[in-house]
């Protein structure tokens, strides 16, 4: 009798098992919990958004309190035009970083109430990002131009700062309109259908997908020819990066040339003492206040280039790559680089606070330590203290450079009144940006 359960009798049954993607199917393994609530990259992005938001609000609020405060301990020195430009930069940074981070956090955490609001929400978020980034860049350019005018033409006609600032805000809003119409919103991404078994290859990485329930903004360039994406990427790079960097390069180049031509000359070691008590700096040397403001403008320009360059470089590389035109707005790389670009708005106020003097003891100690590191020690014996820390007595007798004995004529031809010692130079510290 033939065995009914032998393999030769039973027909081969079709394989009706459904392949389960790793992390996307039902968790049928006993003793294990539910899958994570989101991808690690999304959680890290949310943490960075929160940190940048807190840092930006704290720094820019401090700058606004110092510049706009009345007479409290937060009030800083008043400089009319630069105060106005720095206040506008702080407001632009709050708008760029705070508005974008808040909208992005609300987008990620609250989810999507309706599918009909997808396009409006995506376009509004894109308008916030592009206009805030442009306003901050335009204010940095205006500060560099104002410093260039103050260094090269100190007695010339001042720049119309208020009109130029209003033009910068308006231009940022107008240039942000095209990016607002190249994105569209989708409903929350459902669970993707499983692919056929023949399409799965061993060792192949899983395809890029959206987390279930996550809302994404998609570009409109996927079904269009490739040159549409290239034209838009070129416009975005020129309007948001190339044009501001060109103006910043010209202004900072002029600042560096003036700084180099008016650099202070090293004093001679064996030069005889002058009859005047206070040796004023050479007329060709720039005042220390202008040098500090020049450094602040250069640092703001370098910070803008360093934070914005990765985003626009990756944008152009994705547009001109040989691969298929992917969804740039929905990729994780775009979101990560956008967070890096927002760090520019969070760090700008701390550049001003670093160069600006304050009443905080910790800040005074920091300036003292930095000044002792970056400033050359004065070699005059009259400026040195004794072994017990006691200073010379003449500092009480000639405390000011206008001591009246310095202007007396010689008593006779045979003898001259000994000149008073040179005044002690000011401590080299980053006290004020102006």
From Swiss-Prot:
Q: Which family does it belong to?
A: Belongs to the G-protein coupled receptor 1 family.
InterPro entries noted in UniProt: GPCR_Rhodpsn (IPR000276), GPCR_Rhodpsn_7TM (IPR017452)
Please list the disulfide bridges.
none
**A GO BP entry:** cellular response to hormone stimulus
Q: Which residues cross the membrane?
A: 4-24, 44-64, 82-102, 163-183, 238-258, 294-314, 335-355
Location of this chain's protein in the cell: Cell membrane
Matching Pfam families: 7tm_1
Protein name per the record: Probable G-protein coupled receptor 150
- Residue ranges, annotated region (Disordered): 188-210, 398-434
Q: How does it sit in the membrane?
A: Multi-pass membrane protein
Tell me which UniProt keywords the record has, alphabetically.
Cell membrane, G-protein coupled receptor, Membrane, Receptor, Transducer, Transmembrane, Transmembrane helix
């Amino acid at each position: 009798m033939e065995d009914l359960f032998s393999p030769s009798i039973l027909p081969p049954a079709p394989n009706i098992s459904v392949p389960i993607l790793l992390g996307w199917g039902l968790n049928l393994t006993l003793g294990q919990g539910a899958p994570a609530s989101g991808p690690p990259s999304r959680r890290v992005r949310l943490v960075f958004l929160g940190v940048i938001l807190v840092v930006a609000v704290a720094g820019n609020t401090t700058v606004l309190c110092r510049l706009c405060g009345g007479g409290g301990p937060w009030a800083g020195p008043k400089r009319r035009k630069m105060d106005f430009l720095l206040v506008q930069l702080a407001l632009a940074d709050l708008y760029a970083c705070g508005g974008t981070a808040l909208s992005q956090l609300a987008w990620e955490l609250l989810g999507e109430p309706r599918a009909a609001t997808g396009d409006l929400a995506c376009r509004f978020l894109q308008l916030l990002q592009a206009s805030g980034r442009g306003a901050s860049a335009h204010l940095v350019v205006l500060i560099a131009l104002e410093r260039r005018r103050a260094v090269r033409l100190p007695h010339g006609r001042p720049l119309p700062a208020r009109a130029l600032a209003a033009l910068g805000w308006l231009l940022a809003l107008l240039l942000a309109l095209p990016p607002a119409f190249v994105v569209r919103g989708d409903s929350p991404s459902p669970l993707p259908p499983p692919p056929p078994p023949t399409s799965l290859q061993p060792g192949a990485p899983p395809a890029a997908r959206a987390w279930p329930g996550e809302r994404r903004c998609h570009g409109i360039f996927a079904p269009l020819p490739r040159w549409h994406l290239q034209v838009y990427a070129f416009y975005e790079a020129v309007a948001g990066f190339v044009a501001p960097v060109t103006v910043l390069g010209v202004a900072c180049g002029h600042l560096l040339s003036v700084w180099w031509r008016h650099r202070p000359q090293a004093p001679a070691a064996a030069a005889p003492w002058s009859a005047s008590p206070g040796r004023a700096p050479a007329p060709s040397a720039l005042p220390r206040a202008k040098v500090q403001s020049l450094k602040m403008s250069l640092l703001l320009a370098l910070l803008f280039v360093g934070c914005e360059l990765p985003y626009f470089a990756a944008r152009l590389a994705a547009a001109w790559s040989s691969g298929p035109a992917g969804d740039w707005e929905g990729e994780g790389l775009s979101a990560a680089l956008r967070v890096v670009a927002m760090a520019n708005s969070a760090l700008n106020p701390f550049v001003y606070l670093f160069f600006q003097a304050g009443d905080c003891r910790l800040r005074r100690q920091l300036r003292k330590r930095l000044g002792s590191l970056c400033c050359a020690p004065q070699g005059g014996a009259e400026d040195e203290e004794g072994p017990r820390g006691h200073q010379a007595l003449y500092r009480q007798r000639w405390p000011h450079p206008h001591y009246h004995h310095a202007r007396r004529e010689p008593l006779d031809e045979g003898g001259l009144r000994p000149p008073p010692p040179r005044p002690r130079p000011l401590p080299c510290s980053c006290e004020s940006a102006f």
